[in-house]
Amino acid sequence: MTAEKYTFPANYGEFDAVFREYRAIFEKQLRTVCDSFCDNGAKYRALYDAASYSLEAGGKRIRPVLAFEMCRVCGGDINDAVPAAVAVEMIHTFSLIHDDLPCMDDDDMRRGRPSCHKAHGEAVALLAGDALSAYAGKYICCLLYTSDAADD
């Protein structure tokens, strides 16, 4: 890649527009992912609720945005980066859930609301973080084993 192929946003307004576009793409996919947790049955409903609670708590979403932008800079279609963007946010959220636990920082609040262990209990929060770590691997596999990749 040469420097001529990639242009940085000319100004903050352009950067902000791209950032908002990427966040919108990500948030839509994240909603789908959180909804799909429920498809796994009622047996683990508390676990999925806790994972969704933490994933949907907001934040800047800089990691998924960077995944989209890295894909674009390398000449890819940003839609192909959606699984990676979801996975990286799951890993980040998993780390926040575990960091807030009483055995670590024991934080009561995260992103302006009760931390996962305060809202759902310590045991459920621990397992929700673990589940997000496992689900991140699943979404990376989606990225690696698409039908297009299999054809190469």
Describe each PLM feature range:
Residues M90, L96-H98:
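Long, hydrophobic/aromatic-enriched structural stretches that serve as scaffold segments
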